[in-house]
Amino acid sequence: MQHNTFLPNDAVEEQKQNPYYGILRAVETDLRLGQRWCELKVHVLDIDLKTKRPLLSGIPVNGQLKDKLQYVLPLYLQETISIEFLSSVFDSMKKLSLPLVKDARGLSGDEFFLYLGIMCSDSTIVYYKITDGLIKPRQNDEE
């Protein structure tokens, strides 16, 4: 049986009681239909005692990230994030034993990264790469 890419991911629908369901669904829809990612999965991160945040993982089918597992943390534009928050996100990912994606340009070679999927007030979603550590800037001729 072939999966209909126009239907929402069942794992997203299971998160209807999560306060971040709206942004999760918007980012998942953009990744699935707009960016054409496949194998989308929802993970739930325990950021602190009272905060459970959804995290999406998937594989882009074209572009520079083709066939490489990626993670996206859905956020609203008006949310305030801090270095401590981002650190707790990476720590939560490690606790779930998720296969983390490394950035080879990192100073130690062990820097992990994910993308923030930020939804603006007009429903536009922008993606920012966040790294757990320091990396050297990318040159124009590098991928």
Curated annotation (Swiss-Prot):
Q: Which GO terms describe its molecular function?
A: nucleic acid binding
Leader peptide range in chain numbering: none
Q: Which UniProt keywords apply?
A: tRNA processing
SUPFAM superfamilies given for it? tRNA-intron endonuclease catalytic domain-like
Recorded GO cellular component terms are: cytosol; nucleus; tRNA-intron endonuclease complex
GO biological process terms on file: tRNA-type intron splice site recognition and cleavage
InterPro entries named in the record: Sen15_fungi, tRNA-endonuc_su_Sen15, tRNA_endonuc-like_dom_sf, tRNA_intron_Endo_cat-like_sf
The keyword Zinc-finger belongs to this UniProt entry's keyword annotation = no
What PANTHER family does the entry give? Answer: TRNA-SPLICING ENDONUCLEASE SUBUNIT SEN15
What family classification does the UniProt entry report for this protein?
Belongs to the SEN15 family.
Q: What does this protein do?
A: Non-catalytic subunit of the tRNA-splicing endonuclease complex, a complex responsible for identification and cleavage of the splice sites in pre-tRNA. It cleaves pre-tRNA at the 5' and 3' splice sites to release the intron. The products are an intron and two tRNA half-molecules bearing 2',3' cyclic phosphate and 5'-OH termini. There are no conserved sequences at the splice sites, but the intron is invariably located at the same site in the gene, placing the splice sites an invariant distance from the constant structural features of the tRNA body.
Q: Partners and quaternary state?
A: tRNA splicing endonuclease is a heterotetramer composed of sen2, sen15, sen34 and sen54. Interacts directly with sen34.
Q: What is this protein called?
A: Probable tRNA-splicing endonuclease subunit sen15
Q: What is the lineage of its organism?
A: Eukaryota, Fungi, Dikarya, Ascomycota, Taphrinomycotina
